[in-house]
Regions:
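Conserved catalytic-core motifs of eukaryotic protein kinase domains, centered on the activation segment
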Residues: 27-29, 53-60, 120-123, 220-221
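A short loop-to-beta-strand scaffold at the N-terminal edge of the catalytic core in hydrolase folds
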Residues: 1-7
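Helix-rich cap/lid subdomain of alpha/beta-hydrolase
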Residues: 118-177, 181, 188
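Active-site nucleophile elbow and catalytic-triad environment of alpha/beta-hydrolase enzymes
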Residues: 180-199
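Conserved loop-alpha-helix segment in the C-terminal half of the alpha/beta-hydrolase fold
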Residues: 204-229
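Active-site loop/oxyanion-hole signature of alpha/beta-hydrolase fold enzymes
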Residues: 5, 37, 44-87
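Conserved hydrolase catalytic core segment
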Residues: 80-121
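Conserved HGGG/HGGXW glycine-rich cap/lid loop of the alpha/beta-hydrolase fold
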Residues: 7-52, 225
């Protein structure tokens, strides 16, 4: 089961908010009211393994292809149209694949610290994150979000980011995500991501790239997105 928020469902103008690692739709708690006030319908799911969605205990249950399939099922179930996609971090790796499968359903795109890797390596920052995610004994999701935030979170906010992960058995999805990024040419989704880039090059709807300048994992990816889309 995939949990999602559906605010202002009567509106025909949809904003789809896809979160990344290791957060959940709580990430968008301050954005959603403003979008609703502007007359938008807001859909904000929790990816499988995160938030209030189901969580597999077996890390091997999580694959890039499975995440695309799980989120696509929700997308098809809701029968959304006229969508602006806001895709942050892993929300982009998943959301951009959904957009390129059905581009006519989207009216705009905002990419934030994300992209579609095609197996040509990773930044040193990402490699450090990958190593950390697999070796640290206490994978404290609230602390990770806190350390990556320019706005310092209070204790209640940190606790909210930790709430979906009461112990290590709930964190298989969060531990798995860094392993699933296509940073080598042997990854089984490289071909599909290359094909998705070809679709993105033809996407003519309004597109915006918003990247944090201190993000070491997606350094300079905003320039690539601006150039290609």
């Amino acid at each position: 089961r995939m949990h999602y928020l559906d605010e202002n469902p009567s509106s025909k103008d949809v904003v789809l908010l896809l979160h990344g690692e290791p957060s959940w739709c709580y990430l968008y708690r301050k954005i959603i009211p403003h979008l609703v006030e502007a007359g938008k319908r807001v859909i904000a799911p929790d990816l499988i393994g995160f938030g209030k969605s189901d969580k597999y205990k077996d890390k091997d249950a999580y694959t890039y292809a499975n995440h695309i399939d799980w989120t696509s099922q929700l997308f098809d179930h809701l029968q959304l149209d006229n969508i602006i996609l806001f895709a942050q971090d892993w929300g982009g790796l998943i959301g951009l694949r959904i957009l390129t499968a059905q581009p006519d359903k989207f009216s705009g795109l905002i990419v934030s610290n994300s992209g579609l890797p095609v197996g040509i390596g990773a930044t040193e920052g990402f490699n450090q994150w990958l190593n950390y995610s697999q070796t640290v004994e206490d994978f404290n999701c609230g602390k990770i979000v806190y350390q990556g935030s320019m706005k310092k979170l209070d204790e209640a906010e940190i606790a909210a980011y930790n709430a979906p992960f009461p112990d290590e058995t709930y964190k298989a999805g969060a531990r798995a995500f860094p392993l699933l990024v296509p940073i080598t040419d042997g990854h089984d989704q490289v071909k599909e991501n290359i094909e998705a880039w070809e679709v993105l090059k033809t996407f003519t709807k309004p597109t915006l790239a918003i990247f944090g300048e201190y993000d070491m994992s997606f350094r300079d990816q905003d320039k690539y997105i601006i150039e290609k889309i």
